[in-house]
Swiss-Prot record:
It comes from Parafrankia sp. (strain EAN1pec). This is NADH-quinone oxidoreductase subunit K. It holds the Pfam family Oxidored_q2. One of its GO terms (biological process) is ATP synthesis coupled electron transport. The lineage of its organism: Bacteria, Bacillati, Actinomycetota, Actinomycetes, Frankiales. NDH-1 is composed of 14 different subunits. Subunits NuoA, H, J, K, L, M, N constitute the membrane sector of the complex. It is found in: Cell membrane. Belongs to the complex I subunit 4L family. The gene is nuoK.
């Protein structure tokens, strides 16, 4: 398959993720949109790695996945703390945690 198709798909996935981050107010949906954007970046890294015939892009994609796994743990803990205190998963309630 043509590598340009993978890059177009990656751009489309990143755009969908960015739209989800900017438009939605639910913390879980925003969190999933960020993960979608990270996976789009991974697809781009692997595509360029395949084009150039090197492993650097695949190694960087692996490290992005490791960081994303750590982000999942921390992000879900924060979302759970917000939900327990406010009974809502809205992004607007994040500012209220400091009171």
């Amino acid at each position: 398959m043509n590598p340009a198709n993978y890059l177009i798909l990656s751009g489309l996935l990143f755009t969908i993720g960015a739209t989800g981050v900017l438009v939605r107010r639910n913390a879980i949906v925003v969190f999933m949109s960020i993960e979608l954007m990270l996976n789009a970046v991974n697809l781009t890294l692997v595509t360029f790695s395949r084009i150039h015939g090197t492993l650097e892009g695949q190694i960087m994609a692996f490290f992005v996945m490791v960081v994303a796994a750590a982000e999942v743990v921390v992000g879900l803990a924060i979302i759970l703390a917000i939900f327990r205190t406010r009974r809502s998963a809205s992004v607007d309630d994040v500012n209220l945690l400091k009171y």
